[in-house]
């Protein structure tokens, strides 16, 4: 694929070999113990992904009992090489053994994207005339593909549009789910462009133990939370895959074109699919790719095929869009541009991202003030010392403290955040005080969101989800003849 990283692997082959052996043992033990099918399939996917990484690094297939030589470049006892092998990121799994979380600099190299640097942030500020969002200022959105092309288009008064999405797997969304929508709302405001939001209820039906009716009902409930973020109904189209596929021939035609240009071998290598996966899973990446092309939305862009889109998303979704970027020029479309965010850590620590399937790892948008306080106090991983005396003497570690991490996402004032960092690091602020600060930020944030959501009616949802013409700044440029 054109956009796959081509540099040297960041992983020690010996460490990767050992990981494959250990994962193989896990798969065998799960099968022998008659573990749930989903658990076995997840383990098998991880095994195949590890083997693919090994083949890329070594140029040959993994062979059990035949470890690579220990003199491979990059091993040499380098702790960074070992750490890289312990970071695992794909669209379904995020895992690291480091309490600091994923090494995003190495992930940029691994995925072949570009770092969002100060120069790019300054250019965004000049183009929009607006102060950069805190997610940009603090490196929460840290990586991109072709953002300079988007800015070129904007500065030359050429149109582009935003595309993001949500896989609705439960009625309640959590704080981590808010991150891309908060940022996308800011992008919509400062660039004054249309936005399409894909609700991939078909994906959740294929991957989860859900009925079609349940998957669609989650779409409607999640759409209410998304609308409550403040999107402009005149510039925003939210669509259900289950619903829109039958309403838009242009959308389905793009899905079929993508399917024709991507082989099973490619998607197996990208996503780790196995022979036991249903064909719906294998073909789904084309459905997630299709909104990247403007003529998938004829009510908005008519038959224009040349309007580029910008996709804000977490970096675990990048494999879908590396595939999309490879296909785009072959079917007559510009490559989508991307802005990648870091992961929102679980309460228990940055080794994994927040998950809706674990209520103790997540703060939900439906939680009460009492529940928020209890979860932060009981479950938020602390970077503090074992005793007050030690903490006062040596200070806390903000790099692993979840409460501080959450404040970097949600506390707007940079000076206040920096003062908290200094106080906690010096020992002047205790863990309990830091957690109280976070609670004082989260409780009103979620209460205000709940109030906005309560005002979202079924009619409001229908209005956002109706295929229709949108109103936006560059509309006249889209339809000039």
From Swiss-Prot:
Disulphide bond pairs: none
GO annotation, biological process: angiogenesis; positive regulation of gene expression; positive regulation of protein-containing complex assembly; regulation of angiogenesis; tryptophanyl-tRNA aminoacylation
UniProt keyword terms in alphabetical order: Aminoacyl-tRNA synthetase, Angiogenesis, ATP-binding, Cytoplasm, Ligase, Nucleotide-binding, Phosphoprotein, Protein biosynthesis
UniProt-recorded name of the protein: Tryptophan--tRNA ligase, cytoplasmic
WHEP-TRS domain ranges (all copies): 12-68
Residue numbers bearing the N6-succinyllysine modification: 158
Post-translational modification: Proteolytic cleavage generates 2 forms; T1-TrpRS and T2-TrpRS.
Organism name: Rattus norvegicus (Rat)
Top EC class of this enzyme: ligase
Single GO MF annotation: protein domain specific binding
Stretches the record annotates as Disordered: 65-85
């Amino acid at each position: 694929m054109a956009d796959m990283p081509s540099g040297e692997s960041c992983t020690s082959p010996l460490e990767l070999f050992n990981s494959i052996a250990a994962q193989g043992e896990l798969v065998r033990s799960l099968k022998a113990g008659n573990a749930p099918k989903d658990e076995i399939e997840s383990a098998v996917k991880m095994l195949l992904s590890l083997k693919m990484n090994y083949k890329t690094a070594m140029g040959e297939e993994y062979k059990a009992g035949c470890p690579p030589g220990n003199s491979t470049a990059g091993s040499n006892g380098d702790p960074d090489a070992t750490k890289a092998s312990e970071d695992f990121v794909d669209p379904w799994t995020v895992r690291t053994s480091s309490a600091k979380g994923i090494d995003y600099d190495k992930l940029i190299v691994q995925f072949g994207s570009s770092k969002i640097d100060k120069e790019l942030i300054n250019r965004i500020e000049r183009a929009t005339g607006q102060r950069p969002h805190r997610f940009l200022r603090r490196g929460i959105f840290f990586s991109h593909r072709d953002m300079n092309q988007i800015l070129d288009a904007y500065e030359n008064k050429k149109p582009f549009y935003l595309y993001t999405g949500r896989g609705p797997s439960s009625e309640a969304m959590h704080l981590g789910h808010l991150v891309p929508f908060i940022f996308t709302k800011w992008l919509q405001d400062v660039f004054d462009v249309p936005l399409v939001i894909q609700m991939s209820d078909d994906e959740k039906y294929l991957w989860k133990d859900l009925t079609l009716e349940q998957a669609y009902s989650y779409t409607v409930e999640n759409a209410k939370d998304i609308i409550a973020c403040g999107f402009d109904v005149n510039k925003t189209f939210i669509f259900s895959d289950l619903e829109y596929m039958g309403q838009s021939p242009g959308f389905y035609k793009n899905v079929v074109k993508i399917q024709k240009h991507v082989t099973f071998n490619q998607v197996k290598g990208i996503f780790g699919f196995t022979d036991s996966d249903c064909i719906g899973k294998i073909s789904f990446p084309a459905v997630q790719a299709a909104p990247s092309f403007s003529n998938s939305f004829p009510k908005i862009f008519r038959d224009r095929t040349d309007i580029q889109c910008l996709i804000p998303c977490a970096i675990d979704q990048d494999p879908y869009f590396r595939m999309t970027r490879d296909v785009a020029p072959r079917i007559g479309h510009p490559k989508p541009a991307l802005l990648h965010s870091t992961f929102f850590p679980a309460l228990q620590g940055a080794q994994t991202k927040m998950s809706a399937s674990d209520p103790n790892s997540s703060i939900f948008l439906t939680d009460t003030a009492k529940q928020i306080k209890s979860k932060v106090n009981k479950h938020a991983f602390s970077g503090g010392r074992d005793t007050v005396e030690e903490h006062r003497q040596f200070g806390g570690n903000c790099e692993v403290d979840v409460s501080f991490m959450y404040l970097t996402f949600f506390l707007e004032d940079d000076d206040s955040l920096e003062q908290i960092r200094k106080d906690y690091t010096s020992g002047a602020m205790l863990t309990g005080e830091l957690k109280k600060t976070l609670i004082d930020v989260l409780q009103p944030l979620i209460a205000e969101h709940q109030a906005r959501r309560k005002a979202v009616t079924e009619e409001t949802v229908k209005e956002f989800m109706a295929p229709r013409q949108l109103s936006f700044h560059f509309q006249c440029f889209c339809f000039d003849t």
